[in-house]
Amino acid sequence: TGTTSSDWADVSNWSTGAIPTSSDIVAIDGTFTNEPSISSTDAVAKTVIVTTGNTLTIDETSSLTVSGDFTNTGTVTLNSTADDYSSLIVTGTASGDIVYNRYVNVYDDTLGGGWDLVCSPVGMSIADFITANGSNIQVLDDDYAFSQFNNATGQWERYATAEQTGNFEAGKGYSMATTGGSTVAFTGAMQTADQSINIINNNGLNGVGRRWNLVSNPFPSYINGNAAAGTNNFMDANSAV
């Protein structure tokens, strides 16, 4: 009900008088004094439903894990800073768009640095991304400070400020820098299924080819890299590759 505040972890904000558990169905539906926000906590639920006109915010350093399905026709926003990120894990199916505000480093004109390696955690077109975030992305000559790596040439290829086509590829990494150290918004449907990333080997006979591929996390959540406690962590799952 949001009677006291927007704090998900405050029992007085819930109609049941209890903080949701992994067995609960959470419906954010109706008119509330305060819309819910998950802040500095790891929230759980069995099912989450956010209806039209309602919002749910997951702040940096916070997470929401849904063991069942996630349905959104309202507005669900995940935030981040330079050092901290939010996480949304859905074990079942997910429907509706989410917004992930991803912090990206400021371009350093003196050193040519400040680039971050990023991946879209949602399905989104390049054109829509540039339209929504173009004013935040650094421009270098006639190109954005937003590029993909071409391992056939061993070069980074920047996106031009002219109109772009195509979509972000799930699991493919990109490099990016912003004008002032700010967030860029990725808006679209989140991935929930396992993703297989094609690794391209361009190691040509003349020695100028490249084998490097920039593989990135395609989910709005954390992936265990090589944690011993992580079930099917990334390194173990790909040990035969």
What spans do the regions from the language model cover?
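N-terminal exported-region signature
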Residues: 3-19, 23-38, 44, 49-241
